[in-house]
Amino acid sequence: MNVNLMWFRNDLRLSDNSALHFSCRNNASTVLALFIATPKQWERHCLAPKKKMLIYKNIVALKKKITELGIIFYYYESTDYLESTNYIIEFCKIHKVTSIFFNLEYEFYERQRDKIIKKKLKKNNIIINCFHDSVLITPGSIKNSYGKMYKKFSYFKYKCIKQLQLNIPSCFPKPQNKNLHDHYSLDFTIPIFHTYLEKFDANIFPIGEDIVYEKLKFFIKYAFNKYNFDQEIFELNSTSMLSAHLSIGVISPRQCVTLLFKEYPDIIHKLEECKWINELLWREFYQHLLYFYPNIGQNQSLYHWENRIKWDNNLYYLNLWKQGNTGYPIIDAGMRQLKQLGWISNRLRMITASFLVKNLLIDWRKGEEYFMSQLIDGDFASNNGNWQWIASVGTDSMPYFRIFNPMLQSKKFDINAKFIRKYIPELSNVSTYNIHNPCDNNKTNKIHSKYPQPIINYYHSKKKTLLVFKHAKCSNKL
């Protein structure tokens, strides 16, 4: 009898799961499920404690759901990726596994792990079935006239939209109940991961695919039409708040798109104008880039001129930025929200990142690493791509001379300073003008006795950065 092993990784759901769907397609086969936790490896990758807890909670929910389908769920905690490959081979031998099914991951070390496990599986005559499941469109199917990956998002987006319009995505259904035959039910509690974890707000980041899917339905039905106008505002209800669940595969991008098309059939002809689709396609773009340029995962940018940038890398300033004590209220409110909630809006990510790189002249990699260590929705491809974009060193990045002005951003997106006052209570009684203009108080350069004065002058730092980046770029042409 055939025994199929479903290896869960970054795809913690039953519905629309390519590998799970095909592992269960043959009713005559026995299906086993396995998840391997690698907390030490996660620590090396700076995975946020809140995200590790989100993974744990959703693994517990997944085990319950898949057991109800008659599929036995196994759990193992490994020291690292290499040790996990050894465990899988032993598992396959013990349970007489004939085929293994899993969804691909594009990060550098995950691909190295898969390369190793594929060799071992082939050596043991185990059939390998792997799928591109975390994206809307298979990497490699969107190419330029030279047969290569687009490095400009606008071209990539145009091609993606055309493909989505021609081939509307469909979702795989949840598998039907399996017959356990002579297998017995494994009744055990998944032990807590052996690593530092932090609690998160389950009202904002719910647990389990059914509740998350309901959250998606609510957003599309009641909040989607406001997204084009509210997306840049800092309030939580201005976005879908699904990024954390997309990052660990509790929900798929296909589910997002198919549900949107179902609710608004005519939107398929207006995808270019849809900001939510735009955000999903940025995520897609960075996933495809990582697939084609795996060295991005090794602290490298695609353009070598950035190696000539002379970073200040002031560790004192870096720590003040992390703590939310720069003296720029919008920066500090964003960094404090990141620390407390494990999430900040896309606009705030750009503002705070620009300040670190373009005003404090600190290497973007240090900011990238810190964000990963805090974000409950930390996704390597998107986080890396966004940091390279803001630092003007990645593909299709903004020009190096574009630098976000935190005062103007503050006035535009937090008009009444409601967000700032929420996360910086010491400024609760300070006037909105002074909050938005921390550099304009000529007497003390301080807007409150308990709040720090600006650590740098924005305008002076901007001039310095422009010179440093211009020199690095011009030197590259010599």
From Swiss-Prot:
Region (Interaction with DNA): 279-286, 346-347
Note describing how the cofactor binds: Binds 1 FAD per subunit. Binds 1 5,10-methenyltetrahydrofolate (MTHF) non-covalently per subunit.
GO MF annotations in UniProt: deoxyribodipyrimidine photo-lyase activity; DNA binding; FAD binding
Cofactor: FAD; (6R)-5,10-methylene-5,6,7,8-tetrahydrofolate
Entry EC number(s): 4.1.99.3
Entry annotated with the keyword Transport: no
Gene Ontology biological-process entries: DNA repair; response to light stimulus
Keywords: Chromophore, DNA damage, DNA repair, DNA-binding, FAD, Flavoprotein, Lyase, Nucleotide-binding
NCBIfam families hit by this protein: PRK10674.1
Name of the protein in question: Deoxyribodipyrimidine photo-lyase
Organism: Buchnera aphidicola subsp. Baizongia pistaciae (strain Bp)
Lineage summary: Bacteria, Pseudomonadati, Pseudomonadota, Gammaproteobacteria, Enterobacterales
